[in-house]
């Protein structure tokens, strides 16, 4: 069977003329256990004596000689072919381990890419998350095995990168469609998946640069685009520079293709490369293709670079060229959409940017525009930076909110509202009265465009702390009940954190803390998450640190400076002779003053609550972060750390908890 496979392999690759000759008069055979040899008949042996030949025999002999020359040349070809074929490693054999792994990889890639784009009859994406993420993980595991054995070609490696890139987009889409942002202070699936994809892409890029695996131009483009979407701009450039300066010409070729260079052009400009140098690179890369039309991806990169360099006329000229059939044939709609969005968010000429924005709203373009919220946010920021005209900002925000409609996901609306509300409070930071009136008008207007939701109020509650007004914070807190919006744990954290911007008694902070803990227990948390501890920290330690930086007085209370030896000496009467007659009254006044200080000492409150509730930490490592870690990062907390072990916190209230576990 093995010999038959070898023969079939050679027959499919050697010239037909030689195969035919080897079958006929010469009766030749291939020997695969040594160099290819040719067995001749005795009549063909030049050492054998031959009788005298007639003229016809001479002609026949001449033809045979010519045939022998052809055969000899073909024999040499087969020998060369033999040297380049590893007959002991036929990967296409069904019995080969590599064959089964390659098939498994192909199945995973096909299954993953299909799951990421499957749609229902109504056009909506089908939720096949578990199948998709399983395919991503399995593909990466098989990739590692094939890299070790050297059985992975550039096509399959590129498809693995493509799947990783698609996974980033799927992860991002799932995040923006969530009703609330994930708790990044505790563990979340999307956070873990982002880290996993990032590390996987780094592993693949390392394999490419180390010549362990090769990729096509498409794989290189997906790789760099992935790092760029992860906001790892410096790493994106470093990978590209290392690739184009590689000694491996195949790597250089892959990373110099137009659609790859288009990814890095804007980054090169942002990192100091001159516009003229980028134009030269653009022209060089544009010529590096045999396609009849240019690369839309390269042009998109050049347009973004032109906009960043304020070369708006050049950008418009390229866009017009992209839209014409003469210049680029039928351009991919995705690239046209990306170019349109680039003009909205990245063009510093506000007239041009707003023109593209209005065209996107009107939906009368020959290509479909999915108005990305990131582009709208960039436009709003550019308007504010250049004009400081808040009315223009309101106009764009209002139009975008109406465009997205009432059913848009909280992720998209929250992203837009966060940018808008930040600019709002920046505009009214010193004019609280006018700002409060305008804020009420905006809340009413938003309720008419899209019903008031929890994320919208959360954003306002977070940003309004710049006014440092307790009445405003309490008024916004009441709005949740006014609009019949249930408070999630995120809201309780924001409320507690807001206490760090105003002056309130410690009892108020304790009350907000207990409410937060009760909510955490209610939703099934089994330990106090990092985000909960962070809210307490900001309400207490961060507040005190800011007061200290701003010149406020700060000193430890009596309980903070407790000295057992000194207390024992006082109790024994050792210092009675040194007391003045009126010392009793003064001592009482001193104690009252210290008691008031203790009631308002937020750092003391922080460590008391930490010690009382620390048993509900996730693990000792978390407890160390919220005790010694805080003292390490906050100067005002350092004197308190040594007092934690001696604190009596038995009187601090802990509500009944059903789900919390004693972990520490």
Curated annotation (Swiss-Prot):
Transit peptide: 1-32
An annotated GO BP: sporulation resulting in formation of a cellular spore
Region (Disordered): 38-68
GO cellular component: mitochondrial inner membrane
Keywords carried by this UniProt record: Membrane, Mitochondrion, Mitochondrion inner membrane, Phosphoprotein, Sporulation, Transit peptide
Membrane topology of this protein: Peripheral membrane protein
Post-translational changes noted in the entry: Phosphorylated. Phosphorylation promotes binding to RNA.
Coiled coil: none
Subcellular location: Mitochondrion inner membrane
Main location: mitochondrion
Residue spans of biased composition, Basic and acidic residues class: 55-68
UniProt family annotation: Belongs to the RMD9 family.
Subunit structure: Monomer.
Functional summary from the UniProt entry: Binds the 3'-UTR of mitochondrial mRNAs. Involved in the processing or stability of mitochondrial mRNAs.
Name this polypeptide is given: RNA-binding protein RMD9, mitochondrial
Gene it is expressed from: RMD9
């Amino acid at each position: 069977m093995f010999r038959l496979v070898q023969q079939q392999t050679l027959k499919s690759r050697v010239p037909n003329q030689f195969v035919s000759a080897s079958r006929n008069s010469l009766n030749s055979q291939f020997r695969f256990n040594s160099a290819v040899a040719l067995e001749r008949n005795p009549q063909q042996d030049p050492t054998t004596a031959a009788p005298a030949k007639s003229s016809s025999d001479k002609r026949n002999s001449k033809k045979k000689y010519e045939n022998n020359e052809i055969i000899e040349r073909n024999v040499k070809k087969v020998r060369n072919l033999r040297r380049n074929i590893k007959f002991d490693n036929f990967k296409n054999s069904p019995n080969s381990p590599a064959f089964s792994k390659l098939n498994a990889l192909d199945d995973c890639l096909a299954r993953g890419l299909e799951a990421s784009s499957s749609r229902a009859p109504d056009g909506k994406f089908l939720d096949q998350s578990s199948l998709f993420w399983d395919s991503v993980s399995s593909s990466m595991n098989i990739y590692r095995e094939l890299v070790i054995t050297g059985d992975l070609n550039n096509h399959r490696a590129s498809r693995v990168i493509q799947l990783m890139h698609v996974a980033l987009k799927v992860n991002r889409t799932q995040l923006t469609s969530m009703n609330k942002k994930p708790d990044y202070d505790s563990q979340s699936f999307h956070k873990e998946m982002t880290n996993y994809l990032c590390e996987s892409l780094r592993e693949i890029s390392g394999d490419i640069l180390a010549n362990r695996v090769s990729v096509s131009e498409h794989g290189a483009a997906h790789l760099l685009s992935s790092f760029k979407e992860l906001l790892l701009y410096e790493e994106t450039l470093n990978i590209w520079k290392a690739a184009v300066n590689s000694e491996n010409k195949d790597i250089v070729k892959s990373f110099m293709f137009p659609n790859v260079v288009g990814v890095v052009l804007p980054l090169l400009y942002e990192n100091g490369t001159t516009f003229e140098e980028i134009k030269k690179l653009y022209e060089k890369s544009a010529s590096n293709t045999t396609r009849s039309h240019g690369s839309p991806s390269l042009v998109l990169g050049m347009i973004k670079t032109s906009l960043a360099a304020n070369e708006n006329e050049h950008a418009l000229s390229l866009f017009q060229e992209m839209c014409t059939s003469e210049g680029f044939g039928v351009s991919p709609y995705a690239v046209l959409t990306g170019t349109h969005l680039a003009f909205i968010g990245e063009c510093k000429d506000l007239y041009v940017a707003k023109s593209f924005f209005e065209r996107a709203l009107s939906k009368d373009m020959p290509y479909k525009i999915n108005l990305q919220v990131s582009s709208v946010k960039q436009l709003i920021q550019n308007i504010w930076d250049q004009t400081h005209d808040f009315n223009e900002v309101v106009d764009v925000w209002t139009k975008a909110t109406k465009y997205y409609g009432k059913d848009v996901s909280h992720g998209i609306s929250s992203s837009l509202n966060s940018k808008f509300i930040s600019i709002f409070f920046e505009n009214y930071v010193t004019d609280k009265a006018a700002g409060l009136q305008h804020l009420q008008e905006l809340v009413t207007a938003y309720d008419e465009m899209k019903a008031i939701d929890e994320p919208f109020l959360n954003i306002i509650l977070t940003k309004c702390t710049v006014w440092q007004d307790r009445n405003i914070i309490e008024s916004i807190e009441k709005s949740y009940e006014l609009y019949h919006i249930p408070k999630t744990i995120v809201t309780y954290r924001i409320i507690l954190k807001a206490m760090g911007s105003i002056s309130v008694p410690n009892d108020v902070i304790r009350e907000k803390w207990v409410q937060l803990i009760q909510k955490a227990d209610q939703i099934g948390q089994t330990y106090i998450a990092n985000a909960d501890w962070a809210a307490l920290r900001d309400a207490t330690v961060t507040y005190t640190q800011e007061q200290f930086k701003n010149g406020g007085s700060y000193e430890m209370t009596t309980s903070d400076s407790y000295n057992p030896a000194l207390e024992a000496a006082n109790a024994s009467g050792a210092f009675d002779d040194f007391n003045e007659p009126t010392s009793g009254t003064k001592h009482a006044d001193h104690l009252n003053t210290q008691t008031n200080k203790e009631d308002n000492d937020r750092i003391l409150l922080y460590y008391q609550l930490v010690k009382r509730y620390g048993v509900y930490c996730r693990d000792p490592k978390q407890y160390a972060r919220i005790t010694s870690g805080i003292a390490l990062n906050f100067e005002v907390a350092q004197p308190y750390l040594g007092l934690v072990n001696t604190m009596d916190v038995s009187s601090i209230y802990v509500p009944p908890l059903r789900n919390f576990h004693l972990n520490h």
